[in-house]
UniProtKB/Swiss-Prot annotation:
Entry's family note: Belongs to the elongation factor P family.
Pathway assigned to this chain's UniProt record: Protein biosynthesis; polypeptide chain elongation
Gene that specifies this protein: efp
Sorted UniProt keywords: Cytoplasm, Elongation factor, Protein biosynthesis
Entry function: Involved in peptide bond synthesis. Stimulates efficient translation and peptide-bond synthesis on native or reconstituted 70S ribosomes in vitro. Probably functions indirectly by altering the affinity of the ribosome for aminoacyl-tRNA, thus increasing their reactivity as acceptors for peptidyl transferase.
Alphabetized SUPFAM superfamilies for the sequence: Nucleic acid-binding proteins, Translation proteins SH3-like domain
Molecular function GO labels: translation elongation factor activity
Protein name: Elongation factor P
Entry coiled-coil feature ranges: none
């Protein structure tokens, strides 16, 4: 879809120089001399490399049309992840590398967002919030609760995260996956 460079927003995916680029940030600049331009910070979806591009305000850019579908995680076999569409039960496979470091969060029946461009899968994402059980953590020492302090914990998936002092072993917590950090304790 063609549109003006002035309409670029962070989060959009552009077709540029034969590749797909995710717009990370933009800055509108109006110099004292010459025409206004847009400085865009972009990330190549295929390689992950950052790229800076300058567009004239009236330049035409092409926004990529992406298809997003939600699938349910079934199982992983080697480097292949098997997913199922929840309404038509169609099964697909994706490469484990598409999930990057977030593959550690995979759980049975988890909803995975799959993004495709021209019928080719380009990325997959786990949910932003995942519930996990605390497998191991230090016990609380009385008197250490005067200030908000955190202690290390090992979760059921083997991941380490800092949790508040009141969290005990076997507690279920919600982890914020983009930051790999503690979000809240699950209320039962």
């Amino acid at each position: 879809m063609a549109e003006r460079a002035n309409d670029i927003r962070p989060g959009q995916v552009l077709e540029h120089n034969g590749g797909l680029f995710l717009v990370v940030g933009i800055m509108h600049t109006q110099p004292g001399k010459g025409g206004a331009y847009i400085q865009a910070e972009m990330k190549n979806i295929k390689t992950g490399a950052k790229h800076y591009e300058r567009f004239r305000s009236d330049a035409t850019i092409r926004r990529a049309i992406l298809d997003e579908e939600e699938y349910v995680y079934l199982f992983t076999e080697g480097n292949i992840v098997n997913l199922m569409h929840p309404s038509n039960y169609e099964q697909i496979t994706i490469n484990l590398d598409l999930l990057g470091e977030k593959k550690i969060y995979l759980q049975d029946n988890m909803k995975i967002k799959v993004v495709a461009y021209q019928d080719k899968i380009i990325s997959a994402h786990v949910p932003d919030y995942v519930t996990l059980a605390v497998k191991e953590t230090e016990s609380v020492i009385k008197g250490q609760t005067a200030t908000a302090s955190y202690k290390p914990a090992i979760l059921e998936n083997g991941m380490r995260v800092n949790v508040p002092q009141f969290i005990k072993e076997e507690d279920k917590i919600v982890v914020y996956t983009p930051g790999d950090s503690y979000y809240e304790r699950v209320k039962e």
